[in-house]
């Protein structure tokens, strides 16, 4: 009887020991995974924060440069003038002489409104002189087919920009726009916002 009890107790203790070992092993594995996850995730988060900071600095710099170029009379330049560094795939992003199409242009910045809000205050596009640099344009309608699916769904002409038209000023020539969009005042294109979102359709 005593031997049987001893064997039973030994078995129970063995089972408990196995469970303890299993718990320890699970804890160690989780700890190792946690140690591996922390160094791997931390640089990613740090890189994201660093990238956001760089975007802010770049956006502020670009905004200042655009404002300066507008003040220096870039708006009086002929059709086809570009603000350098705004078009990723040149040379077909700017309007060619004689009136052509915007092809393959991907414009920056593609930033969320929280970053756009850090831009300098909106400024008014200078009035066009001679040939209209900014064509008159009207608010989009459902019949116009504007938006991400415009032009047969070709999204290279429905460009996602973080552009904002100033409050209380409708979409018309010389309307108040964020500096990120000021190049539209000099490029000869007609921007049409769609459904209040950040899709901008560049009509040629």
Curated annotation (Swiss-Prot):
Query: Which portions of the chain have biased composition (kind: Basic residues)?
Result: 85-95
Q: For the region Disordered, give the residue spans.
A: 77-111
> Per the record, where are the segments of Low complexity compositional bias?
96-105
Q: What is this protein called?
A: Putative uncharacterized protein PYCARD-AS1
